[in-house]
Design a protein with these regions (language model features):
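Cysteine-nucleophile amide-bond enzymes
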Residues: 1-181
């Protein structure tokens, strides 16, 4: 995989054909389903929010066996740095494993991307969406989500404010999108 094509500030989306619970909720760019995303920092590093570890900086090469979509936005060097600095301010936050809005010191992957780009204009940079837990194929909320939220004494937050890598991959702010080969 040619990681040399990545530029600072690129949003990197990951496909995992074996993941069903997140990927089954919608379809993203190119008809693919993305279960994860992060921001490329340069020098082979990615900032991302991952289960069990929260917001971390890691090597993008760990995804070399996955299909990767690169989404690029034409921004000034200053704005790209502002996005990266903001993202780095979230290092150490816990993972928002319930995907609920406004969780103190917790973020999930696409929420991290939204928050980092928010810093450019101090307002939503990407289109806002609501959470959808209906499976595309089954048109019902799967038992996985019902049981997950019930375990924490919550209702499934269908329709609450939130984001998803698939919806984000379709945002019209991206000027250039390509699969990394």
């Amino acid at each position: 995989m040619n990681f040399q094509k990545l530029r600072k500030g690129d949003v990197v989306f990951i496909v995992d054909d074996n993941e069903e619970n997140i990927s089954s909720l919608s379809v993203g760019y190119g008809g693919l389903s993305y279960y994860h995303c992060g921001i490329y920092l340069g020098d082979g590093k990615l900032i991302e929010a991952v289960k069990y570890h929260g917001v971390i900086e890691d090597d993008v090469s760990k995804y070399s066996i996955k299909k990767i979509l690169v989404a690029r936005i034409k921004l000034t060097v200053e704005d790209i740095q502002k996005v990266i600095d903001t993202a780095k301010n979230f290092l150490g936050y816990d993972y928002n494993d319930l995907f609920l809005p406004n969780q103190l010191n917790k973020l999930y992957c696409s929420e991290l991307v939204h928050q980092a780009f928010f810093s450019i204009e101090n307002q939503d940079f990407f289109t806002s969406h609501t959470l959808n837990y209906f499976s595309v194929a089954k048109n019902t909320i799967s038992d996985f989500w019902i049981q997950l939220y019930a375990k924490h004494s919550y209702e499934v937050p269908q329709g609450e404010n939130g984001s998803h890598p698939n919806n984000l991959s379709l945002d019209n702010k991206f000027d250039q999108l390509f699969i990394l080969l």
